Structure formats: structure tokens, C-alpha cells
Amino acid sequence: MLRPLGIAVAISCLAISAAWAGPPYLSDDPEPTDYQHYEIYLFGNGEWSNHAMAGETGIDFNYGAAPDLQLTAVLPLAYDGEGHRGLGNVELAAKYRFLHQDADGWDVSFFPRVFLPSASPDVGGQHAALLLPLWAEKDFGTWSLFGGGGCVLNHGGDDRNYCLAGAALTHAITSDLRLGVEVFHQSADALDSKASTSFGAGLTYDLSEHYHLLAYWGPGIQNVRKTARADWYSALLFTF
């Protein structure tokens, strides 16, 4: 079963691109935020398992610090199915794109992410973790294929290191609306947990040049009695 930090890691495999890869999907994309521009998400996410909901709501701040370099900070408020709430695992990350589609055929980036210990004893992971992924993307006109994966150094207590991988295919239905599907897999993240696989669908809709809506729903298809029955994500994105 995904623990609170597992939720954060999975949902944090998100970023944005001109082709609308990344959010709202669990699989990330290699496109960094444009140089000297901002992408700010007001988001909610969670998982439904064993008739209980657990997840986070908060702000995801991204800045294009240099060409091909994105800096990210996430401040989440976490909750669980027992009524506990508090500051979850603050995240700090940097995405660096080292291959470009125009010259190399694919965009490829390295996007390490640090999860700080939760400030609350009741929600979130109680120790630090480190996600080390590679993400790639190929565009075909109005279609985009992106994904990749990596491993999480998450050893502490009953938790253990684990790996994840995913791929998504999206299509621009109109100039404002993009729909997509995804398959995502994660190995067991604790001694008493199981591997999980989900198949999800998402959409992005441009309200204007600077305001965007994102949504995702992904039911589990592997070990659903021990893992999340479904993952969800929604956000209002500001770009400028």
C-alpha cells in the first residue's frame, strides 16, 4: 500500500511543458519551466483505499532559473482517513534537460527530488527520501509520448527503497483541450506492502494564456486490496 510519502512521490512526478506533458499525470516529462518564467500549481491529490481517503493539498512552485534548468519547491498540507492533518513532506527539486528533441530526437532530463521529513507526527513520511528519475519525451504533431522512471531512496523503519516507472500518451483535441492516458507502476515501498500498477486518464484545459485546469483519475489494476484503489489529482495552474 502507498504510504503518505509514497503518495507524495507518485504525485510529485509532475511538471509542465509547452506540449502539456507532465501534470496531471504521475509520469513526468523532461521539459523545464521556460527561462525566467513561473509555473505555480494550487493542487489537491490523493488515493482511495480500503474505504478511506489520504492525500495532500498545497502549492507547487516552479521557476526557470536558467535555460534547461527548473527549480521546484512544494509545500503540502497532508491528511489521512483517520482525520489527521498537518504539514507534509516539503519537496525541493531541480530538473536539468541534457538532450533536446530537435538535435537528439528525444528530450531527456534528470529530475532529482528531496523529500524532507514531515513536520507532523501523524501524516507524511517521518524521514527524508530522495527520488532519482530520468524522463524522456517525443512529440508527433498533436500527439506527445512521455515517461520514464527511477528509484526512491526511502529506507527507514518499515519503509524500504523502491522504484517506479510510467508512460503517458496525450493528444490535443482542440487548441485549448488535451486528453491522455497513462500506465504507471511502483514496486513495494514497505515491508508489508505490495507492488502497484494503475491505468489512468487525464485532461488539461486552457482557460486563458495564464490560467489552466488539470485533472486526473487512475484506478489501480494490481494488488488493489493492498494498494490504492484509485489515485486522483486536480490543480489550477498559473503561468507567467
Whereabouts are the PLM-identified features?
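Cleavable N-terminal export/targeting peptides
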Residues: 1-26
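Transmembrane beta-barrel domains of Gram-negative outer membranes and organellar outer membranes
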Residues: 20-240
